[in-house]
Swiss-Prot record:
Gene symbol of the encoding locus: ureA
Region spans: Urease gamma: 1-101
Pathway(s) the chain acts in: Nitrogen metabolism; urea degradation; CO(2) and NH(3) from urea (urease route): step 1/1
EC number, UniProt record: 3.5.1.5
Region described as Urease beta: 102-223
Name under which the protein is recorded: Urease subunit alpha
Organism: Campylobacter lari
TM ranges: none
Record-level Gene Ontology MF annotations: nickel cation binding; urease activity
Keyword Plastid recorded: no
Catalytic activity: urea + 2 H2O + H(+) = hydrogencarbonate + 2 NH4(+)
NCBIfam families tied to this protein: PRK13192.1, PRK13203.1, urease_beta, urease_gam
């Protein structure tokens, strides 16, 4: 017995659809893959009986309801396309919105809080003036150790030891050439261990290591 790659794929889809059908008959709610396989399985069987494409498109919308699937699945299956063999050749059958979507849950839906989220609440902040003495823009990310930023940014680095920008995680502040602006800084949280960046610290944030970091910053031209 020899099968083409396409025939093997249909056999796999048929097998998956049969499993999904068994679970549906046991009143088990289908997940995304099971729902997709079940509808394709039924369409394959109906095509074998030589129903028309238009008939399959109509029937395809009646095979499952939102009660047959896990919450959120109906909104994920907005379209199904499958190539099926008919007596007069292979045809593409498209089912739009195969499951009536009356879900209480929609995949990817965003639920917004009615209350404002306070950024870095209860964190003590300081403000420092920073100027870009270089000839290129410099961008600093939210969690970059501000003490170790580009040496062309001029500010009181000692005050910035152990601190980062007081901005939302993943955002940044851009300093254009010659620009001066005031930024807000807060202390690092967690273990307060700073590694990497410009390798001025590479240790826990404390007074002893601060002295070492200042010395290294001076050696490397950051002060």
């Amino acid at each position: 017995m020899h099968f083409t790659q396409q025939q093997l794929q249909r056999l796999m889809l048929h097998y998956a659809g049969k499993i999904a059908k068994d679970r549906k008959e046991q009143k088990i709610k289908l997940n995304y893959n099971e729902a997709l396989a079940y509808i394709c399985y039924e369409l394959m069987e109906l095509a074998r009986k030589n129903l028309s494409v238009s008939e399959l498109m109509s029937i395809g919308k009646t095979l499952l309801t939102s009660e047959d699937v896990i919450d959120g699945v109906a909104s994920m299956l907005d379209e199904i396309q499958i190539e099926l063999p008919f007596e007069d050749g292979t045809k593409l059958v498209t089912i739009h919105e195969p499951i009536a979507n009356d879900d209480k849950i929609k995949a990817g839906e965003i639920f917004l809080s009615s209350e404002f989220i306070v950024l870095n609440e209860n964190k003590t902040s300081i403000e420092i003036k920073v100027s870009n003495k270089g000839d290129r823009p410099i961008q600093v990310g939210s969690h970059f150790h501000f003490f170790e930023v580009n040496r062309f940014l001029s500010f009181d680095r000692e005050k910035a030891y152990g601190k980062r920008l007081n901005i939302a995680s993943g955002t940044s502040v851009r300093f254009e050439p010659g620009e001066e602006k005031t930024v807000s800084l807060i202390e690092f949280g967690g273990l307060k261990k700073v590694l990497g960046f410009n390798n001025l610290c590479d240790d826990f944030i404390n007074d002893e290591n601060k002295t070492k970091a200042l010395s290294k910053a001076k050696e490397k031209g950051f002060l």
